[in-house]
Amino acid sequence: MLWKNLDELFLKYDRVVILTLSSGLSSYFESLSIIKEDYKDKHLVCIDSRSVSIGILWLVDEINLLLKNNPSDEELISLVKQRSQKIIGGVIVNNLDQLIAGGRVKKTKGIIAKALRLKLIVRWNGQLDFMDKTPNLSTAIDKLLDIIDNQNHWRTNGIKNIAILTDLENESQINSLKTSLQEKIRQTIEIKISYLPGCIYAHVGLNNFAILIEAK
């Protein structure tokens, strides 16, 4: 399917840019090296987004702006590298079953954490890293916002984009999260709602949510 799409694109364009899911969460970027061999005579640019979900769309917007000036491949890659460092997120994990089943949390520790109803905070900055735990959802959100701020300094620089990524389907639950987050960030900006990608919930399980912030 990808080969067919590329063939069609190269009939219309001299250069094709592919922005992939973060290589820390998927092998898709590495697999493109095989495809690039088939297009040696074409101008194909493959860039690791180091991001997920709506964060990739934010990067696409930046790339489209730069493409108006006919940038070099190196300028495109540099832009994505710089902007991806501003897009940081993390997951608040309520259900530890998938983490225990996948061996990412030892069974004994997992049983204790479940008994105490602990929420795990998992940051992603290109890959997943366990950062903290707390029994309280509001405190978990506060801690995650601090963790993100330590990386991209959104409190100082301001927020360019922010989103809640979730597979939750209860609208009132999502709206409650949105209201709580709006109060905590203390900035006037629309909070988008987007999907929690499969590469995330494959590790942390279902019925969780993440916060993704792009700093200015």
UniProtKB/Swiss-Prot annotation:
The keyword Iron does not apply. The keyword Lipid biosynthesis does not apply. It holds the Pfam family DegV. PROSITE patterns: DEGV (PS51482). Residues 1-215 form the DegV domain. Hexadecanoate binds at residue 26. GO terms for molecular function: lipid binding. InterPro entries: DegV (IPR003797), DegV_C (IPR043168), DegV_domain_contain (IPR050270). Keywords: Lipid-binding. May bind long-chain fatty acids, such as palmitate, and may play a role in lipid transport or fatty acid metabolism. PANTHER family: DEGV DOMAIN-CONTAINING PROTEIN DR_1986-RELATED, FATTY ACID-BINDING PROTEIN TM_1468. This is DegV domain-containing protein UU190.
